[in-house]
Amino acid sequence: MFESVQGLLDEHAAIQAQLGDPAVYADQKLARKLGRRSAQLNGIVEAYHRWESIRDDLAAAKEMADEDPEFAAEVPELEASLETAAAKLRRLLIPRDPDDARNVILEVKGGEGGDEAALFAADLLRMYSRYAESRGWKTELISATESDLGGYKDVQMAVKGNSNDPAEGVYARLKFEGGVHRVQRVPVTESQGRIHTSAAGVLVLPEVDEPEELEINQNDLKIDVYRSSGPGGQSVNTTDSAVRITHLPTGIVVAMQNEKSQLQNREAGMRVLRARILAHQQEQIDAENSAQRKSQIRTMDRSERIRTYNYPENRIADHRTGYKAYNLDQVMNGDLEPVIQSAIEMDEQARLDAIGE
């Protein structure tokens, strides 16, 4: 059992030797790559040694069981521990998403429902901000287009984590949030107290660590400049500081107007553009990988309705995993972990099933 782990143990040992060589850090790109891979393997190595230790203890207990009742009494407990350790190791051996350890750019757009949808988009952004805070992550507002009532027509926020462990990476935790989030509640603009349904779309993009990691040919870019505008479309700048960047090969378009200068908006736009191109490339890889296609959760498609937030019933329901709870007030305040974990566990099971086929 777990014969394939030996190759990973050897790789881990080789990486530790490299990281112990000060000369490696002269190449920061290589050092980061080795650090990420080391973090990916650390959990597997620890889990394997734990399983191996219990296996050996069980073998010794069985050998001594006939002569010593105390050893015989340990056998059932060790067998249960061995199965638990084996299950953990099997899950760790599931091929991980290569982007799991990355930071993300989170985009939220108000959808059906006009002003109410924009207000809900703002509520979602606040929810994710508080969840990030609870995990010790840092957030940075990149761009926002406000509605007349103070919501967001669209907004982009960077989320930066504090761990190299892929399982604890920002993208690993947030990637299943992509899709349509539907809300049912009485809008602030509703005078009759009627419940309305509106929606907001969420897109989670893995962020490129360094600009040189993803080369973009400047000849592939079309850059337009214009005057920035505020709620209602009124002009808020007398200079052409807003920037629209089109990546011609993919057709991806990024518009940025929040910063005061054209240069700052261009830099922010390129940051988002790199993330979108990286996501586009990963989608193409996923389409060619049958194991990835069998994952029941992961999606970049914001047209898929993934969750409903019902305020009158204080209920949240995830339509992919079947998760349901009546603590919506807590969820909107950032208590997202149980909801997110349900998606992660369903995805892990789907990947395990795919490996077994």
UniProtKB/Swiss-Prot annotation:
SMART domains, alphabetized: PCRF (SM00937)
Primary localisation category: cytoplasm
One Gene Ontology cellular component annotation held by this UniProt entry: cytoplasm
Pfam families: PCRF (PF03462), RF-1 (PF00472)
Disulfide bonds listed in the record: none
PTM comment, free text: Methylated by PrmC. Methylation increases the termination efficiency of RF1.
GO molecular function, one term: translation release factor activity, codon specific
TM stretches of this protein: none
Xref: Gene3D superfamilies: 3.30.160.20, 3.30.70.1660, 6.10.140.1950
Superkingdom of source: Bacteria
Function (record text): Peptide chain release factor 1 directs the termination of translation in response to the peptide chain termination codons UAG and UAA.
Database matches in HAMAP family: Rel_fac_1
PANTHER family: LD18447P
UniProt similarity note: Belongs to the prokaryotic/mitochondrial release factor family.
The name this protein goes by in its record: Peptide chain release factor 1
Organism of derivation: Arthrobacter sp. (strain FB24)
Lineage: Bacteria, Bacillati, Actinomycetota, Actinomycetes, Micrococcales
